Swiss-Prot record:
Residues the record lists as Phosphothreonine modifications: T67
Keyword terms, alphabetized: Phosphoprotein
Biased composition regions of type Acidic residues, renumbered to the chain: 23-32, 151-162
Name of the molecule in the record: UPF0690 protein C1orf52 homolog
Bias kind Basic and acidic residues: ranges: 51-61, 172-182
Origin species: Bos taurus (Bovine)
InterPro entries from the UniProt entry: DUF4660 (IPR029089)
Length: 182
C-alpha cells in the first residue's frame, strides 16, 4: 500500500539516475528520496501538496461524467444540431470545354489499303547472268542492238563504242577468287 501512495512518476525519475545499486534496498530508497524532493518543491512552488488533486479520474468515471462536448450542447433543443457545424465547400463554376491546339493529321476517309500490282517479271536469264557475272559470249543480250546488215557492208564503230566494249573486259588472274556483286 505504501508503494501505491507514492508519486507514480517518481519511479521513472529515479530509474534514470547515474548511480546503480545491486541490492533491492538501495533501489527502493532512491525513489523515496526523489518523491520527497518532488513533494517539497511542489509545496513551495504552488501549494499543490494534495495527491488527490494531481490524480486523473479513471476511465469509467471520466466517460460517465462527459457524454458530449460542451460546444455541441443546446439547452433548448437537447439534441445536437449538426447542420450548424457543417462547413460546405464553395461551388466551382462549370468549366468550358476548349479544343486542344495541335498539328495532328486528320484520319483518312477510308481505311482500306491500296493494292499494288506485283512488279513486272524480269527475264531470269538476264537476272542470273548479272548475279554470277556471266557476261560471256553466251550471255543474253538486249534485243535493241540486234540489226541485220546487208551482205558486204561492215559497221564502222566509233571510238566511243570501242571504249565501252573494252571497258567491259577485264583480266582475271588464276590466283584471285572471283568477287560477286551484291
Amino acid at each position: 500500500m505504501a508503494a501505491e501512495e507514492k508519486d507514480p512518476l517518481s519511479y521513472f525519475a529515479a530509474y534514470g539516475s547515474s548511480s546503480s545499486g545491486s541490492s533491492d534496498e538501495e533501489d527502493n530508497s532512491e525513489p523515496e528520496e526523489t518523491s520527497r524532493k518532488g513533494q517539497d518543491t511542489a509545496k513551495s512552488a504552488g501549494g499543490y501538496g494534495n495527491k488527490a488533486e494531481k490524480r486523473l479520474p479513471g476511465p469509467d468515471e471520466l466517460f460517465r461524467s462527459v457524454t458530449r462536448p460542451a460546444f455541441l450542447y443546446n439547452p433548448l433543443n437537447k439534441q445536437i444540431d449538426w447542420e450548424r457545424h457543417v462547413v460546405k465547400a464553395p461551388e466551382e463554376p462549370p468549366k468550358e470545354f476548349k479544343i486542344w491546339k495541335s498539328h495532328y493529321v486528320p484520319p483518312p476517309e477510308t481505311y482500306s489499303t491500296e493494292k499494288k500490282p506485283p512488279p513486272p517479271e524480269l527475264d531470269m536469264a538476264i537476272k542470273w547472268s548479272n548475279i554470277y557475272e556471266d557476261n560471256g559470249d553466251d550471255a543474253p543480250q538486249n534485243a535493241k542492238k540486234a540489226r541485220l546488215l546487208p551482205e558486204g557492208e561492215e559497221t564502222v564503230e566509233s571510238d566511243d563504242e570501242k571504249d565501252e566494249h573494252t571497258s567491259k573486259k577485264r583480266k582475271i588472274e588464276l590466283g584471285e577468287p572471283t568477287k560477286k556483286k551484291k
